[in-house]
């Protein structure tokens, strides 16, 4: 499962910065072995000018900390076609299939003076470790669907090209903050944190992003986790 999300300005806190994107990804709890949500934040940047329209991203690959467990059976599947989801929007999927949403997400067209445009984002389970991310422009009658798939502790999202302006005729994601809240059913958790907090005191999240020009950039974010107190030695 994945995620991406936004705040006014750069990604806050101890985000890891690279030439093409700043990255922060965390669980919503620091407790080991607990049901958790996922909070993903990315600020996309052009490597030659951090204030310009970014080079469009084509694929996002997120690798979660060692020991992270996913349970596909917790959230029901939204099985409508991509076309129906695009035409009908959020209402096409049953509420129980919703995974999470964007908070302050934006994109850029590249047209002079256009700046950043708000994007509404909602994600739905699609079954068989797959999910779909529905993006909707707040200013234009435009919806797009990004397909995601999970393998082990890795989640991959393929981002479609969208219409835009110069220099490439495409739109580009700028700010992303996607929050997937915790989900559980019958003692099962859709996502569960690793059983242990390692001796480093942090869990490591990794991102590998591929861009329209063929560029690939990797980044890492380390989240503090809660170590269990050692039992006292009996005398």
Question: For each of these PLM feature ranges, what is it?
Answer:
Residues 6-15:
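C-terminal segment of classical bacterial N-terminal signal peptides
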Residues 16-235:
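Ser/Thr/Pro/Gly-rich, low-complexity intrinsically disordered stalk/linker tracts of secreted
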């Amino acid at each position: 499962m994945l995620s991406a999300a936004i705040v006014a300005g750069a990604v806050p806190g101890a985000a890891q910065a690279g030439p093409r994107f700043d990255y922060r990804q965390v669980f919503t709890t620091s407790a080991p072995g607990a049901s958790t949500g996922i909070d993903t934040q990315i600020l996309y940047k052009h490597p030659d000018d951090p204030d310009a329209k970014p080079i469009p991203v084509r694929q996002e690959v997120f690798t979660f900390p060692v020991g992270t467990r996913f349970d596909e059976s917790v959230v029901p599947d939204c099985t409508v076609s991509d076309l129906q989801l695009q035409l009908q929007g959020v209402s096409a999927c049953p509420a129980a299939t919703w995974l999470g949403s964007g908070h302050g997400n934006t994109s850029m067209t590249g047209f002079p003076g256009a700046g950043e445009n708000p994007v509404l984002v909602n994600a739905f389970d699609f079954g068989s470790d797959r999910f779909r991310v529905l993006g909707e422009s707040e200013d234009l009658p435009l919806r797009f669907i990004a397909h995601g798939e999970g393998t082990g502790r890795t989640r991959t999202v393929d981002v479609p090209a969208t219409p835009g302006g110069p220099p490439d005729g495409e739109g580009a994601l700028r700010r992303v903050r996607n929050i997937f809240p915790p989900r559980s059913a019958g003692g099962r958790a859709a996502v569960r944190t690793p059983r242990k907090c390692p001796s480093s005191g942090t869990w490591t999240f990794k991102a590998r992003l591929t861009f329209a020009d063929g560029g690939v950039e990797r980044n890492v974010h380390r989240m503090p986790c809660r170590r269990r107190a050692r039992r006292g030695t009996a005398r």
